[in-house]
Amino acid sequence: IHNGHLHVISQLIEKKIIDRLILVPAGQPLLRGNAPIASGANRRAMCQLAISTLPTGISSHVEINPIEILRDGPSYAIDTVEAVRSSYPDDEIFLIMGADAYSKIDQWHRADELHTMVSIICINRPGFPAHGIDIAALDVSATAVRAGLSADVPEIVAAFMRENRLYDN
């Protein structure tokens, strides 16, 4: 999780676009091409640390749900959405993603069903065609963070990454 994610979370909550955000650390996404380097427990801990840096008025609206990292096998968004919907049957569910992910959504498992189950909030990102809302997203790349080419994470997360020797940082 990096500063770009935290900026999006803050903007969505401050602008009252959403009431609550469920942050799901990634499990084993098939389209990414390789398994995550950090363990599920480490990814969850980094999310908790990052969210702790937000003002209470924002962080109190964020829940970290480990559903994907606890699941065996590949992680499909549709399965996560079904689980969230069963936990919150009376709520409207939004799936929030950057324009980079949105550009590949038709390749996702059961993509047609996914579109019927959730409203998608697509965050415009520099370098990708605009499809969604513009909240002045920061130009931060998770790939660059993992490669050690970006320092765009809260210092507490960077320290955790160094202490646990994650991503060669």
PLM regions: where:
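Nucleotidyltransferase catalytic core that binds NTPs
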Residues: 1-169
